[in-house]
Amino acid sequence: SVYGDHPGLPKKEGIEGHVLSPYALTKKTDEEFGRLYKTLYGLDTYGMRYFNVFGRRQNPEGMYAAVIPKFLKLLLKDEAPTINGDGRQSRDFTYIDNVIEANLKACLAPSEAAGEAFNIGSGGRVYLIDLYYELCEALGKKIEPVFGPARKGDIRDSNADISKARELLDYDPDYDFEKGIRLAIDWYKENLK
């Protein structure tokens, strides 16, 4: 979200555009507070830029529900999800266990890495329409999606450059999209009945 309207891929720390939503502005402000507290008070802070986190126990309800649990819930009920836009927008979906690993690594990181922001993603890129049909296939469903207008404030594409987190936090995601999505699908099939 802090990358805003900057079109470049992959998204790299230090190359941000104008933010597109109040949420993105609060994320950017939080990172600035972290840098300031490191400079003024010596407090080690680490700005973690999570890219489209998904996994078990994610709430599929509500206005801000993530796309994967929302799609799974509807497909399991034999209902057609709405894809905002044309489905060709892409995201770097990051399995929750990668985020947990990154947070633990940040807790143990050297002070030299403090005050910095880090992309926490898988480093991959998945188109929403491909995600949708992969979920359909995994669930044995043949339901066509409904397409709606693109949401205001949404970016078109997202893909994390995780090289800084690899170097300074020793972050190495264990779960690529395929491995994570299989675990998530299994969990939702078992728990969303």
Residue ranges of each PLM-predicted region?
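Catalytic helix-loop patch of NAD(P)-dependent Rossmann-fold dehydrogenases
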Residues: 2-47, 59-64
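Short beta-strand->alpha-helix junction loop in the catalytic core
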Residues: 55-57, 152
